[in-house]
């Protein structure tokens, strides 16, 4: 395997046995691709904005004299970049400009004669843009649009599984779901009549819709039934025989023909009888006259002579009717073929309950059902029905819907119209009747072939279309009203409805969520989440068990592990590692093609529908060198079931062992040894890990760490290869390799790093360079680590030395005992950044003022403020300190004569303002790391604002000029090369000032041209620099666009350092979570024979019942990894020669059959080996991929190599007594995470605070400064102890007895500790509620 310079710094030993056929795809592509489709110009007009415009335009006036046509659109440049939008609290968006053409036709002239054409570009609002990391910045906060899993449009056949009717009869139904428009349902009732519902309203007989489609009774019967033909000959009744129809019937008379009896009366007709009849080619048989009674006539029969209707279609025949028919000369009678087995009389029966008899009455009936209470007219009824399913404006199946519809009805073509046709409706009814007759199956709604993904782009397009449709109405009216000669397109269009619809979607849709930004993994998982909730989806309450359950089609598409615990379980899922969506929005997963029993490296993506037709082997099937299966029988999946197949039956093979799981679950080593429930907790808890002060890569990983860290976008990744030319804490400059440069550019890439910014969850985002000056880098190398990444690998926690043993009850019930060393070394110290804002408004009594001159506040309280009244950066503040001084004018109060006198003597006192300063919340203390002042346009900036502005300008100028210098240096080195090649002496050239170089002329024309080109570039560079600086200056100095009535906003950022302490929640990666019970002194911790104490003591009883054995294997393997690191460390300390080091490290990498990754250290230089050793001295990182991990024997081998006991257990000694513990203890290294459930955020105590308005009881919860609820069970406890007075106190003065508690407060202040309980307010509430029921109830005082 070839490693780049940066990758050679630290290589993970990989235990994976299966070769990596397909690299992990870019993990955010589901978001980025979908949005790209939405905004990029699509010439076909299938997707995105283009499709939305084409579906609404052209808009014609009601008279048809004019129309507004759409030509094209373009997105402008965003005003602010992403960072500026976050700081200013605005939306990162681009203006949408649309070119429209207004065409006016001549009124009197023949059709289509154009009178006037006007074309103009019109502004149509702002479209939020996606950042490079798949998020949106809306009002300054990063949000994610979660993809939705919804029912695909199309037709679905289902049954109620016998739950509706008491008899348990299974009722079948069909439902046509369009992408937009009315739903059409067909359903059977218990009497086997077929009904139709439109939009889930009341049901009508299904034949009404056929009559509305202009079918007569005869035509309807013709469509759905085969005919039985009777002929009357010589007063005998004969029937045309179709032998196949007789199968399974019992003969009610002798079946004979040509004097031969084929079946005797009462006998059952078998296949043998039918063969006999067919062989003798029997066409007609004689039947008794009674046989025809009860048969149903297939068409109208009229008496030719009188014109009288003898019997209408769908009437039952009786012997009298037969006689009448015979008399009037009808010798041939067509009846419907029905039987109880597989040709039910459903449509015939339905026609009998159908009240309508022609098209108009059917349309009226449908109109009455859709619009009850409105008087129907013919036109209204016709247009309503037409608009329901046959109008492109109101109804659209979409390409997906049409494809699913045609596939479901087994049609050849998969494309077609977006509206329904007569055939569509009839075919659906036919198939439903077939299913009722026992032919065909119902659909499985939870099958992923029937559910599709709706991603950002599609949802934004739908929202945009909604806005456009609103605009369409207004445009139509304007086209009809106005004087068209003077109007321009922009007078027609009002952009408000469009931007309102888009804004509403991005700002407040259920699927537009505040991004979970705890750590890089939680960001990535949030963007790959798939929700079944949201508009057009399910609701938590209605979702049953089946929808939430794991379905066989989830394999490789949706993760069976990662889903929230609680009410949303199974409704919110995560995309599997390799899954992607196809053009129709269905999830697909990759497989390797198997041809003639040989597994190839050809990759095919299959959707759930296609997968059902193949036999697919698992990824861990053993193959030989050529790719043949080793075993004769291979475990495979086919049609959702797993079983053994012979090797030549296999069609495909899984791509990778981690194909089944999501990114979160693929980061859990030894996942295959954990119980599923615990794995779920492990995957979910990794997302809650807080980035530690110094990230520490996991010793035992799965090899997915690098992919997650790079794709999450928190690291700085090299866009092109080159050499590091400059590096400091906030910038990295790369001189690009010659072969990767664009022609005529300076070849310098500058990466500005993010420093100490706040994430959505108040954790700290900070990037630190991990390359040094002069190092070569390649494209895709990590240049700087972000939060929770270490050398470009995801590092959510710390490697801790753990021991599994009880310790004095401090690890009872999942508690965790932690050594003081962990606190001292700041292993789990985290930085949290809080944003506190102070808003100065314009009030009725005058403007609020931000100032240091605050009434009734001592000097000490103002010591941290500057003269503008704003805290200075670097100040250490604690709860209650003033951060921003602000005074609010208060209403004039009536002054007493004494006050008036004092005022007159001492002048104007500051009593007409009240202190409304921003203070640090209680329980928070930290350091001020940044202050930002935003001032409204036209309001004078204070001194602090001007200082900040000046500083920003200085910084911007410094950044830009440094950038310019770097680019200039690159350019001049190329100019020098051209000059020297053109014959100028290098020494003389270096004596000449650089600016004069461009004045030199060369004789060689080609070189002279090159020189002139470079000179042009130089001028352009300087011009560009001036332009950038001017733009920056304008942005910095312009006023801010603040909300109405707001004059100034001051934002103060506090950095809070949180050390680990009892009460904090910690967890491993296997769902093994617990709370810290005690921080133990180092000297009291158990230690080994070398005197090394353990860091954490965990309870062994937490493992067997939970069945997450993965943690034990991880501990052993971690121990081995550390042991090897220790040996390398010892060798480095002894300064042994490189050859020995190289040999030992090579041995470690070669251990276990590494097919996937042969690390060949012979290709490394000595310096590279030394640097690798330096990075391995704390432990050799190991990858053990999911379902393909290290085996027990391999772990033992590795332990042996690290000179450690192969049992993984060692003798420990009690730190307090020095005595050896009775038995050996499992000790090793486990990766522990500190979760974002910190005791500091949860600890809370209430003094007198706010009360609920109605019940007058204290509020609940920390955010409301609430009290602790003394609930029903606590009352029982006091009752049980007979503590009557305590109980009375709890229910009255400590809760909602308003007078009692006020009096009590006064008494306490006076030092009188007595109480008089009164009437609790909740009793009065109860009285009022009873009175509201009309029962007067009064409390009489005795």
UniProtKB/Swiss-Prot annotation:
Modified residues (N6-acetyllysine): 1022, 1200
The enzyme's E.C. designation: 2.7.7.6
Residues annotated as signal peptide: none
Pfam families: RNA_pol_Rpb2_1 (PF04563), RNA_pol_Rpb2_2 (PF04561), RNA_pol_Rpb2_3 (PF04565), RNA_pol_Rpb2_45 (PF10385), RNA_pol_Rpb2_6 (PF00562), RNA_pol_Rpb2_7 (PF04560)
Stored InterPro entries: DNA-dir_RNA_pol_bsu_ext_1_sf, DNA-dir_RNA_pol_bsu_external_1, DNA-dir_RNA_pol_su2, DNA-dir_RNAP_su2_dom, DNA-dir_RNAP_su2_hyb_sf, RNA_pol_bsu_bac, RNA_pol_bsu_CS, RNA_pol_bsu_protrusion
Alphabetical GO biological process terms: DNA-templated transcription
A molecular function GO annotation: ribonucleoside binding
Role description: DNA-dependent RNA polymerase catalyzes the transcription of DNA into RNA using the four ribonucleoside triphosphates as substrates.
Protein family: Belongs to the RNA polymerase beta chain family.
Stored HAMAP family: RNApol_bact_RpoB
Subunit structure and binding partners: The RNAP catalytic core consists of 2 alpha, 1 beta, 1 beta' and 1 omega subunit. When a sigma factor is associated with the core the holoenzyme is formed, which can initiate transcription.
Name listed for the protein in its UniProt record: DNA-directed RNA polymerase subunit beta
Lineage of source species: Bacteria, Pseudomonadati, Pseudomonadota, Gammaproteobacteria, Enterobacterales
